[in-house]
Amino acid sequence: MNIVHKLLFTLIITSIQVNAQNINVNNIEIIRDNFGVPHIYTKTDKELGYGLAWVHSEDDFKTIQEAYLAGNSLLSKHIGLRGAPIDFLSQLIRSDEIIDSLYSTIDKRFLEVVDGYAQGINRYAELNSSEVLVPKLFPITVKKMLKYSFLQLFVSSEGDRAVRAIFENDFESLTFQRRNELGSNLFSFSTNR
C-alpha cells in the first residue's frame, strides 16, 4: 500500500508541476513606450495574464496586495485595527462559500487568464520578497483573486453602506430603497407599432 501512495503522490506532484510550467516566460515580451505604458506581446492569453500581472506589480505592488488582503480578510494583518471592519465585511458576505459554490460555472478560458495573472504576481513576489506586505497572502490563487472581486462588487453595489446602516441602527440612511422611485430603466412594448 505504501508504494501506491508514493506513486499517487508522485503523479500529483508531476501534474502540478506540468500545470504550473505551462507559462513560458520566454514567450512574453513587455515593451514600455516613452510614457511608460506597457505593451505586452505573448502567444497565449494565459501568458498575457502573467505579463499583465508582472507590469502591474512593477507599477504598484503594494496596492495590488492591499486589495487582495482586503478580499481575503487579511487587511488587518497589514494595517492593524483599521483593517478589521473590511476583514469583517469580507467574512460577512461569505466570499469563500459563494466562490466555492459558483466556481465551476466560470468560463475555463477566463480562469486560465486569471491563473496566469496569479502566477505572474506570485513570481514577482518571489523575486521581490522584501516588498511582500503579508506573507500569508501568498501564493495568490485564482480563488483568492475572485474573493477580492466579490468584495469589490459588493462595495460598488453599496452593500457596505447597507451593512453600516444596519449596525448603526440607521435605516433612514438606506436611501437606495427610495432613490429610484420613478424608475431608471423603463421598457414599453406595444403591438400597435
Indicate residue ranges for each PLM-predicted region.
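Bacterial Sec-dependent N-terminal signal peptides
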Residues: 1-22
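Substrate-recognition/specificity elements adjacent to catalytic centers across diverse enzyme folds
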Residues: 23-193
